[in-house]
Amino acid sequence: MDDLLASIGLTHGTRSSRKGTWTEGARKPVGKKKKLAAETTKVPTPKIDFDFSSLLAKAPAVVHGFSTRSGGVTRVYRPGLPKSQGDLNLGFTSHDERKNVEANRTRMMQALLGKEAKDWKLVTLQQRHTPVVRVLRDTEATHLRGDAVMTDLPHRLLGVMTADCIPVLLYDRKNGAVAAFHAGWRGTLARIVERGVGTMKIEYGTDPKDIVAAIGAGIGPCCYSVGEEVRHEFESQFAYAPELFSDVYESEPIRDKYPLLFMTARAPGHSPIGPQLHLDLWEANRRQLLDAGISAKKISVVGTCTACGTSRYFSHRTEEGFTGRMMSVIGVR
């Protein structure tokens, strides 16, 4: 038997193989097999999705993106997600841990900038629904108070946080300046975007004809109900205010399914609740950009409603305040 085993290259107690070597009684492979076993346990990093402006994407000197809620490590808002998934909460909310937000911001920077991330600084705002526009001149500043920020410094990623409000990004192609705006209804009423363009003229000599603008996802006119007092405020400021508002009747599922049951009680089509007043913040900010002198062809609108799409976006209104924050960012290389 020994001669037979020897003739095929084996002896008692051993077995040879081109892919590795095992000794009798050993249960763990060595060499390449050990490496393969380790690779099978690696968990892939969740994908981080962004919305992008087709216009800004054509400018190689600019980095920009509108974050969504996917690809982070936050689990407090959706604990039912698979263990390998989490929300990309980028705001320091009272619900989330600071370490999670910092990890999410690092992931966002790496996903957007790749190897360049180490050379960039993220600059954010302490937002308060004001018309305050800040100019970043200090290369060391990373946190400012206001609701808009602009700079012509390279490698500064300007960020505004939203969870229904409207983010607006601007790029002056001639002077290499960028700006980011947080525009809720109060900021929009105060013309924060229009003010910002005026500040760019003063600071950088910007000609509005050289500006490319992008309006990101936010609560749409389909979902943004407001009170009559908001309509009165807008009518006092904008001649086109009537075009920004619409009356929306709430649907009644039972009435819609069985209309004959209600015909004797109430005329068809008449809602007992009455219409809700809805505001179009996308259009309100687009009109301000036009009034500031920016060409309609140089304004892009993502046009996605955050309140309708909570699987992709955070929505303060739909999720009743218990939600995270997206970040819209822009910078020049």
What are these regions (language model features)?
Residues M1-R333:
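Active-site microenvironment for binding and transforming phosphate-containing groups
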